[in-house]
């Protein structure tokens, strides 16, 4: 049986920062659970859980579960400075019509 050769399939590339080993010994389970709980309490909005995220990343670096990196390189300050805009009102009983927000600006 012959298979067609698909030239659009690309070879997988490794992550930019190298491997991200699993925490088999649960060395960072407490900060990880604190971060996951924070996400759960904040509807998955990570900007409210940055301190927990920092602690988790620091734990991983301290336990050689990831390469040491300056915390400034993770973009936490950019997130703090970002303007937060409310999500548009959504009523599940109303139909969605494309282009309404553009029409209001014109």
Swiss-Prot record:
Record InterPro entries: COX19, Cys_alpha_HP_mot_SF
UniProt xrefs under PROSITE patterns: CHCH
Sequence motif: Cx9C motif 1, positions: 28-38
Span of domain CHCH: 25-67
Motif Cx9C motif 2, chain ranges: 49-59
A GO biological-process term: mitochondrial cytochrome c oxidase assembly
Protein known as: Cytochrome c oxidase assembly protein COX19
Gene: cox19
Family (UniProt): Belongs to the COX19 family.
SUPFAM superfamilies reported in the protein's UniProt record: Cysteine alpha-hairpin motif
Disulfide bonds: 28-59, 38-49
